[in-house]
Amino acid sequence: MEITLKSGEVSAKITSKGAELKSLKVGNRELMWSADPAFWGKTSPLLFPMIGTLKDGKTLINGSEYKITKHGFARDLELTPEDFSSTSAMFSLTQSDYTKAMFPFDFRFTVRYTLKADGLTVTYRVHNNSNSDMPFCIGAHPAFATPGDMTDYRLEFPKLETAAVPNYNLSTGLHEENNRRPLIDGDTVLLLSHEMFYQDVCYFDKLRSRSVQLLNKENVGVRVDFPDFTSLGVWQAKDAPFLCIEPWCGSADFDDCSGVFAEKRGVEILPPDGEKAFTYTITAIELKAKV
């Protein structure tokens, strides 16, 4: 099932499978990647209750071993559309025998999409219906179209950033804590290239900013604000004409992790009957040329 939202010149399309955002238009501009399977057949999958991969493909939850699929199961399941209008739609997911075989908790997970004047607000909400603490990771994976030469694009942060990102080992699927590469040093601007992503994701686990702009040389692009998230992944498929800007709480395992899910870096933990919301926004921007 696909739902279309529209308000003035802003429109969005969301499919019930994974509650995935498939299109976001502001005026005549399509902000999202087209999901061309020649590069990557997705547009904006949900990451819950897992981000990335597990060390040795398994984890310990309450002393028992579990295997959770890469990026979690939410992106692959049908979510139930509910409480929707012409400008807002909410989708929900609760536990099942399938999810409990990977993640032994009762929960309610919702995602709400709400149009705004120049883009979209996305809010994830997680409720723990279990009688014990529930650890989980949560993240977004929106892919933005980057037509033309990738070297014409840059990321701009509102705060000065110094970041050496952990190497992502393509063989193990793990971040390497003691093998980092510097990407930005006391600056607000990061120039982009395809080669930057040949080792997969650039994971900013010590970022000061909670907002980032993706701009081309004409200063046209998008801004992603992510006040409720603790880190940021930036990724593209090899030589692809898109860039994913991914607000995260959690990540793929590091090579020095304990293997206990509740001890994962960036993990969130909800007490019984606890609830927490995570919001990010996508805003279309066209900046005036710098003088």
Predicted regions and their residues:
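Acidic/His-leaning functional-site neighborhoods
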Residues: 10, 26, 66, 71-83, ...
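Short Pro-Gly-centered flexible turn/kink motifs
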Residues: 14, 59-67, 268-285
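Extended, loop-rich substrate-binding clefts of extracytoplasmic carbohydrate-active enzymes
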Residues: 68-117
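Beta-strand-rich interaction surfaces with strong enrichment in secreted/lumenal proteins
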Residues: 110-112, 265-270
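Active-site/ligand-binding surface loops and adjacent short beta/alpha elements
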Residues: 133, 143-146, 150-226
